[in-house]
A protein has these predicted regions:
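Conserved short alpha-helical segments that host acidic/polar catalytic motifs at enzyme active sites
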Residues: 1-448, 454, 469, 477
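Short beta-alpha connecting loops at secondary-structure transitions
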Residues: 213-222, 327-333, 556-561, 590-612
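Secondary-structure transition/capping motifs at alpha-helix termini
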Residues: 153-155, 241-246, 511-521, 545-558, ...
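Conserved short loop/turn motifs at secondary-structure junctions
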Residues: 255-256, 524-533, 558-566
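Acidic, glycine-rich active-site loops and adjacent beta-strand->loop/helix elements
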Residues: 165, 324-326, 527, 563-567, ...
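Non-catalytic terminal/interface segments that mediate subunit docking, oligomerization
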Residues: 151-155, 178, 412, 423-552
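Active-site or pore-adjacent capping/gating segments
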Residues: 342-344, 348-350, 576-613
Length: 613
């Protein structure tokens, strides 16, 4: 489905190749090189090339010239050749007042983002002063045959990331071959839709001086038409260009298991806790290779669901691959070998000539700021919140029966869901692994600014479990703390009102709460009677969530649902998946109280609710 290679920019080779074309390149890292996939039609290609030149000039950089990349199209299959783009390289001069490395690459990043929005039919494989990507829709053995450049003796690089793609979630294409601009990824990001929605919403709260006044021009951060790997690459690239070191960006997006891992230092757990309040994990099986040209790293997902083995040789080589034996090696030359463990990272700093293990990398980042002090000052835990009257009035049986009819409870659901779940409390599959790796904690309140490290970012409410008891919800409603404003919005409407009209009215109430400073929104269907019915809870949650995403308020408001409707596992899974941070199933809990009173559960109410939740 595709193969590619990411290397450092081979200055000696390009200086020679460009000189033959009449292009005089400046010194190493004094220019950037872009690898372009242009439309096949000559007119479209020329228009796109001219557009790029104009954008480069407008951004205050100098355009040096174009080079058509020599390729052997005859090695391609018929399908790959039919959709093969025109492959060109463009060279851009670094301005005198711009530092080499990241500062120059940031200027090139702005150029690329503006160009992508102006010429959507073109694709930029890479545009950097430090790295370049050669890739295409062919097999591994055809890579060096197809690209003549890769066979040149002058093509030199201290690193190479090679990837062969097998499509899982998207169709094969030239653009979707790996490596992307920073990463090569074996696996899939299962949480991608939620991650992308959160990044979209986060754009409203992110601020950085790195781009000056150019931040709006590089948005949206993520191209939602890309593959899951490409979207992860988009996010990492944006974080890096905003000033976050690439290994730190990888650590934040793919954290190791930390919440229940007592072997980690307190400082390290505080670091992860701080970032967990702002960034959800990009989760799924993943072996990740990444490089910005100065560092080369590898990371494994926290479940360790993809293989990654490495060895270090006595001549200074680090070889890491999904299998051993990808290169023929004399065993006597191997100084060290091993495999990446779940959630761990290996990093080579090419500028310093250092090979850093996971602890060296993570502990350095954990020590950058007083994360523990910030959390002690600002993170509020629901279990620590007290209310004067902690007794919640029980729901009368007659009222419970009426509400069960209103919300469509059946005898089978009552018996097979509510009773069975409260009675059995099934243990998770692989309980030991899940206890270490997974976390049910959710964070409620306004999201902090991911790009600015400060104490206020972690001023949120931490809830250990997303299924709330009536007492938990009472605590949240009664919460009167600086930085928190809780507003309850009814999702009831009068009978006969079209659902569309009811939703529009709900959006008005949500926007009103936002303008009044709310950062915790409780959607409630309490009060159902003869004249008022509830908007279906999943519809209400998903509609409000999408409304907040579209209006870029999603990170400013957390949604909690107070509803009598959810009672099955699937109900809770979909509600949480479609936008609710937490759910209070007050009617299901009332049913458990009745079952306990009737002696159908041989445990007390609180134990039964815990098993049910």
């Amino acid at each position: 489905d595709g193969v590619g290679i990411l290397t450092q920019v081979p200055h000696r080779y390009f200086a020679k190749a460009c000189k033959a074309l009449g292009i005089e390149l400046p010194g190493e890292r004094e220019y950037g090189v872009g690898m372009f996939f242009f439309p096949q039609g000559e007119l479209q290609r020329r228009q796109a090339m001219k557009m790029f030149e104009v954008i480069v000039q407008k951004e205050g950089l100098g355009f040096l010239g174009w080079r058509e990349v020599p390729v052997a199209a005859n090695v391609l299959g018929s399908k790959a050749r039919a959709c093969m783009p025109a492959i060109w390289q463009g060279f851009v001069q670094k301005p005198a007042g711009v530092a080499p490395g990241l500062a120059f690459d940031r200027r090139l990043y702005v150029v690329r983002r503006v160009f992508e929005q102006s010429s959507p039919a073109s694709y930029v494989c890479s545009l950097s002063s430090r790295t370049i990507v050669y890739k295409g829709m062919f097999l591994v053995g055809q890579l060096r045959t197809f690209f003549d450049d890769l066979r040149a003796p002058e093509y030199e690089s201290a690193l190479a990331i090679v990837h062969s793609r097998f499509s899982t979630n998207t169709e094969p294409s030239w653009q979707r071959a790996h490596p992307n601009r920073l990463i090569a990824h074996n696996g899939e990001i299962n949480t991608i839709r939620g991650n992308v929605n959160k990044m979209l919403a986060r754009e409203e709260t992110m601020h950085t001086e790195a781009f000056g006044g150019d931040l709006a021009r590089v948005l949206p951060v993520v191209n939602s038409e890309g593959s899951d790997s490409a979207m992860l690459d988009n996010a990492l690239e944006f974080l890096m260009m905003s000033g976050m070191e690439l290994p730190l960006a990888v650590t934040v997006t793919l954290p190791e298991p930390w919440a229940h891992n007592d072997t980690l230092s307190r400082q390290r757990r505080d670091f992860y806790q701080y970032y967990a309040t702002m960034m959800e994990p990009w989760d799924g099986p993943a072996a990740l290779l990444f490089s910005d040209g100065d560092v080369l790293g590898a990371a494994l997902d926290r479940n360790g669901l993809r293989p990654a083995r490495y060895c270090v040789t006595d001549d200074g080589r680090l070889i890491l691959a999904s299998e051993t034996g990808v290169l023929e090696l004399d065993e006597r030359r191997i100084l060290r070998k091993g495999r990446l463990h779940p959630g761990k990272m290996l990093l080579a700093d090419l500028t310093k000539g250092e090979l850093l293990d996971d602890d060296a990398v993570r502990e350095r980042y954990a020590a950058q700021c007083p994360y523990g002090e910030w959390l002690d000052q600002n993170l509020l835990r629901l279990r620590d919140v007290k209310v004067p009257n902690q007794k919640v009035p029980a729901l009368p049986r007659a009222e419970s029966a009426r509400l069960q009819r209103a919300f469509g409870y059946t005898y089978e659901e009552y018996r097979d869901s509510v009773l069975a779940m409260a009675l059995n409390g099934a243990a998770p599959i692989g309980a030991l692994r899940e206890k270490i790796v997974t976390s049910t904690a959710v964070y409620v309140g306004k999201n902090g600014d991911l790009l600015e490290q400060n104490a206020e970012n972690c001023r949120v409410l931490k809830i250990d479990h997303p299924i709330l008891s009536d007492l938990d919800l009472l605590k949240i409603k009664a919460m009167n703390r600086p930085g928190f404003r809780v507003v309850c919005v009814s999702i009831l409407h009068y009978k006969g009102t079209p659902l569309k009209t009811a939703l529009e009215h709900l959006f008005v109430e949500v926007d009103k709460a936002y303008r009044n400073g709310a950062n915790v929104l409780i959607l409630s269907d309490r009060g159902v009677d003869e004249s008022r019915v509830a908007i279906p809870s999943l519809l209400a949650v998903s509609a409000v969530h999408q409304h907040l995403v579209k209006t870029k308020k999603c990170t400013a408001l957390s949604l909690i649902l107070e509803s009598g409707e959810p009672r099955e596992v699937h109900h809770f899974a979909t509600l949480l998946g479609y936008g609710a941070c937490a759910v209070n199933p007050y009617l299901a809990h009332a049913c458990i109280a009745e079952l306990t009173e009737d002696g159908l559960l041989e445990k007390d109410y609180y134990a039964a609710v815990q098993d049910y939740d």
